[in-house]
UniProtKB/Swiss-Prot annotation:
Origin: domain of life: Eukaryota
Region: Disordered, residue numbers: 75-123
Pfam families assigned to the protein according to its UniProt record, in alphabetical order: Homeobox_KN
GO biological process, one term: negative regulation of dipeptide transport
Similarity-based family: Belongs to the TALE/CUP9 homeobox family.
Organism: Saccharomyces cerevisiae (strain ATCC 204508 / S288c) (Baker's yeast)
Subcellular location(s) per record: Nucleus
Miscellaneous notes: Present with 521 molecules/cell in log phase SD medium.
Biased composition (Low complexity): 79-96
Gene Ontology CC terms: nucleus
GO MF, one example: sequence-specific DNA binding
Start-end of Polar residues biased regions: 97-110
Protein name, as recorded: Homeobox protein CUP9
Matching PANTHER family: HOMEOBOX PROTEIN TRANSCRIPTION FACTORS
Amino acid sequence: MNYNCEIQNRNSKNVDNQVSLPPIQVLFNSIEKRSMPELAFSNIEYSHGNLRSSTEEQNYPAPVLLPQHHSIAYPAINSGGTSTTATPTASTVETSKTSSSAMDTQSQYGSSKKSKSASDDAKPCYKSAPIYEIINKEKDAGAQYNRPFSDFVESKSRRKQNSGRRSNLPKETVQILNTWLLNHLNNPYPTQQEKRELLIKTGLTKIQLSNWFINVRRRKIFSDYYTLVNSIPNDNANNTPVERVQNVSAYHNTLSATNNTMYDATSTCSTDYELSKRFAHAPVTRRKKLIDRLEELKKLSNPDMN
């Protein structure tokens, strides 16, 4: 009862002692400028070389605020029953700013940690070669192998269309080469100096010039071979030795006349040594067949070897 009476007495009094606060700008200007408190883990340095794998748990120290001595303002109830707020001091405003900045720092740190963990899950950091690159390469290779057969057929047809047909040499170039060949029928193998001169005159490459001479020599050898085969006399078992000698002499006369007419490279060949010396530098291309033809030519030109 006494307590209720006391409250009624307080309410009956005039409320003259209410607190009036100055503008907020004046209060902010009156606050002393202080440096922000440092976090306890700010001096810890993290290097990229010491980063651990994403499979391991990364425990970072939680931010700890330095102790601050401040007073907390609570709302006060005056004698008239109305609640009033006490005047905020400089320490109170500074404490509120410090707590808000600390909360912002913690939230930023937490968000950065979450984003980092998400990026680590998406693209893990391996000590060796990244496995995801190897997997992607294998997938690309598998996709190439799984291409339909029609694509390969189309690409092959395109390559055939792009590769033009091999054209013949110009007439002027062939005339220059034939002139040189007629002047060197006994030995149709140009020296290095002669090759350089022919390259300058014809404008061909070394490969083109070599291929032309290889083809020409091959044609002459085969031509000589078939000419000899067709001109061999048929030796019957009934022929006498005298008749065989006459046939051989007639065969040699026919061979010499044929060689002089066709300007063959073996026209002046009289011995096996000269023949082997003349064709010592036979081309490597289809060498087996050329050697076989040469051996048969030797046997046909020298009946004594049979």
